[in-house]
């Protein structure tokens, strides 16, 4: 399974809205496997297809490193999520420290709904629903945001968000990458 290169801020593809997966076939299944391998290699707990440059409504998560200790009733296997639809979000809120493989080296506290329910297709194309809370709910919301062109820094104050964007634009310029205003 090849490890895919990660798309890093300020790459404008991160702001694209991903398109639905039309057919779940061996190509999509291989992409899911590659995304998991890429996520594990980078030390992440979630990855959206857009973060490897593929604008499809698809993501992978594996929060077992946390849940095995703190939430043993939560899913302990990786979850492949295709064409997710949020069915509901709780009114109760939770603040979690979030980071992102596309914004390396930066993390911040983000407030989100504590629980949610999503409907999605799995790797085999079967329709599933999952109710999640705590770290899994946060991770799913974070990755679904990516599918809609939203980054976790968009949940921060304008001052903090602009500071992060400027830092990564400067880094991109120093690395002779194309500068793009988000």
UniProtKB/Swiss-Prot annotation:
Cofactor(s) of this protein: Fe(2+)
Catalytic reactions of this protein: N-terminal N-formyl-L-methionyl-[peptide] + H2O = N-terminal L-methionyl-[peptide] + formate
EC number: 3.5.1.88
Annotated keywords: Hydrolase, Iron, Metal-binding, Protein biosynthesis
Domain of life from the UniProt record: Bacteria
Active site: 143
Record carries keyword Heme: no
Comment on bound cofactor: Binds 1 Fe(2+) ion.
Top enzyme class: hydrolase
Annotated positions binding Fe cation: 100, 142, 146
UniProt GO MF annotations: metal ion binding; peptide deformylase activity
Xref: Pfam families: Pep_deformylase (PF01327)
InterPro entries per the UniProt record, alphabetical: Peptide_deformylase (IPR023635), Peptide_deformylase_sf (IPR036821)
SUPFAM superfamilies noted in UniProt: Peptide deformylase
A single GO BP: translation
Record's function text: Removes the formyl group from the N-terminal Met of newly synthesized proteins. Requires at least a dipeptide for an efficient rate of reaction. N-terminal L-methionine is a prerequisite for activity but the enzyme has broad specificity at other positions.
Listed NCBIfam families: pept_deformyl, PRK00150.1-3
Family: Belongs to the polypeptide deformylase family.
Protein name per the record: Peptide deformylase
Taxonomic source organism: Bartonella bacilliformis (strain ATCC 35685 / KC583 / Herrer 020/F12,63)
The organism's taxonomic lineage, starting at the top: Bacteria, Pseudomonadati, Pseudomonadota, Alphaproteobacteria, Hyphomicrobiales
Gene (name only): def
